[in-house]
Amino acid sequence: MKIAILAGDGIGPEIVAQAVRVLETLRSDGLKLELEQGLLGGCAVDAAGEPFPAATRTLVAQADAVILGAVGGPRYDGLPRQLRPEQGLLGIRKALNLFANLRPAVLYPELADASTLKPEVVSGLDILIVRELTGDIYFGEPRGIELRNGQRIGYNTMIYSEAEIRRIARVAFQAARKRSRRLCSVDKMNVLESTQLWRDVVTETAGEYPDVELSHMLVDNAAMQLVRNPRQFDVVVTGNMFGDILSDEASMLTGSIGMLPSASLDERNKGLYEPIHGSAPDIAGKDVANPLATVLSVAMMLRYTFDREEEASRIERAVKKVLADGYRTADIYEPGKMKIGTAAMGDAVLASL
């Protein structure tokens, strides 16, 4: 298993360091891992003059999976667009042909009070949103702003091909098989032809997965149901724009984005794994960042790229034990618990492994 480690910017090096410690512990227990560091984002601009240098491009192409910390920071905002750190992230997604974004939203019992919803509504929350990343209205052509009949008009094209829908549906069905075998497909087929095709193709694809229960929901209802009764969902699959919105909504049900990992996969389940939070330059170097989302990204990598369910579950159990034992970083701290720093949280996870 060859893994590229891209710490990135801001708190990235601190949180990724704890994830690497977890990987090294698994390696010492017999898991065959090869780890290699690379540069992406602002640190790559500083060292190589571009956010996604050739050496990193080669590294990630040869790796089986990539662990990323975070990229960006205000000191790069004045750079030309092509040199901004975020272009490195877009570049790696394109270079690796990543089309499926997996975003879990899990509420740990110990953090139930951190949610903005009542504990009885969100207790037991464990959702996986599978979002298509490369199509839809974000990338459809034609698009633009132009002058017509004396006034400006803006237009975009919402478009999906049958092949694009089928491949993301298969990712979602396979993910559902690893969980409770329930999949909800979200669309707006009552007014949008592109999502009528979405529903048709997902329904056809369900025939390949008779062991998975498929349901459909309109996106406006799904947004409402995520707040009204989020526990009804297990795996949700949807298009790029709807997934962009719903995954952010679901993440806030958990109370802390510092706890949430993500995966972006290609057709062979090679993946880029990263926390959903940003680089938080204001707390960089202060040993206060929460590394648990990055640690949980390692668990996702083991599950979805390497099919190592035992090791993935082992990491997740360790995180649950750390929380049950009362350890908290500043972002999830509450009175009566033990506030600890980034490295100490890494120590606690290793002790629980």
From Swiss-Prot:
Binds 1 Mg(2+) or Mn(2+) ion per subunit. It catalyses: (2R,3S)-3-isopropylmalate + NAD(+) = 4-methyl-2-oxopentanoate + CO2 + NADH. PROSITE patterns: IDH_IMDH. It comes from the Bacteria. The record marks Y138, K188 as: Important for catalysis. Pfam families: Iso_dh (PF00180). Mg(2+) binds at D220, D244, D248. GO terms for cellular component: cytosol. Catalyzes the oxidation of 3-carboxy-2-hydroxy-4-methylpentanoate (3-isopropylmalate) to 3-carboxy-4-methyl-2-oxopentanoate. The product decarboxylates to 4-methyl-2 oxopentanoate. This is 3-isopropylmalate dehydrogenase. It comes from Nitrosospira multiformis (strain ATCC 25196 / NCIMB 11849 / C 71). The gene is leuB.
